[in-house]
Design a protein with these regions (language model features):
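Long, low-complexity, acidic/serine-threonine-proline-glutamine-glycine-rich intrinsically disordered tracts
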Residues: 1-24, 28, 82-94
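Generic structural motif recognizing short loop/turn segments at the entrances and edges of beta-strands
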Residues: 6-8, 31, 39, 74-79
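Structural recognition of beta-strand segments within beta-rich domains
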Residues: 12-16, 20-45, 50-54, 59-63, ...
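Contiguous beta-sheet cores, especially beta-hairpins with glycine/small-residue-rich turns
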Residues: 65-89
Length: 94
């Protein structure tokens, strides 16, 4: 029987000033702001959150004791990034 993982939070850390927007699966905007270098935001983990960022290379995502720091290049706009763990793990393996 598969083990159900309980993930309680997701943290987005800025290593450079980065605009981010996070929507839920109803397209409701939960966060839309610039996070300043060396700051972070913590969100309760919900399935099907979507991230848009204006600086993919400027953010690091922390989830389930994993670090995803290769979403894209500095200054690169990325849309529709699923924050589901199984999607983010693909970035770790690249």
């Amino acid at each position: 029987e598969p083990v159900i993982k309980i993930i309680d939070a997701i943290t987005i850390e800025a290593i450079a000033d980065s605009w981010i927007e996070i929507q839920d699966n109803n397209l409701e905007i939960l966060v839309s702001k610039i996070i300043k270098k060396d700051s972070q935001i913590n969100l309760p983990y919900k399935k099907d959150l979507i991230l848009v960022t204006g600086n993919a290379g400027g953010i690091i995502i922390h989830i389930d004791n994993k670090v995803i720091n290769n979403l894209g290049a500095s200054g690169e706009v990325k849309r529709n990034i699923s924050l589901n763990l199984e999607n983010l793990i693909k970035f770790i393996d690249e």
